[in-house]
Amino acid sequence: MRALNFTILFLFAGIACYSQPQVGLTLIASGFDNPIDITNAGDDRLFIVEQPGEISIIQSSGTVNSTPFLDITSIVNDGGSEQGLLGMAFHPDYSSNGYFYVHYTNSAGDGQISRFNVSSGDPDIADNLSEFPILTVSQPYSNHNGGCIKFGPDNY
């Protein structure tokens, strides 16, 4: 009897393994230049952070905007394998104030956190001239320059 119970248990365990849902990947957009981060602004758009210094938008339809949301390639140093535009975070009150923050490697090779504003006329375009530097951190090496920035549950 004990052997029969074990056999039945073994068979049911085998069946359970094969009844798991299948997981797959679906390509929704392509053509990015070294994408390093993806986030949203609390709406249906996806913002793709690209290491050379652009942030692109994927609309809910899957269409990638032809004009980048932000283009700071002229001030980003992406010469090292772990340098460049490294992260982005939207202010918790972004829908009201239009602030977002980026972390990038500046021309001196230092880590730079800056605030930018969305343009007043188009929610899909940032105001490149609105940069407000927040923090600069010396980076003596071109690697291990992590760049993820986030707001916590306390909105800080």
What are the language-model segments listed below?
Residues M1-P21:
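Bacterial Sec-dependent N-terminal signal peptides
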Residues Q20-Y156:
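Acidic, Gly/Ser/Thr-rich repeat motifs that build Ca2+-stabilized beta-propeller blades
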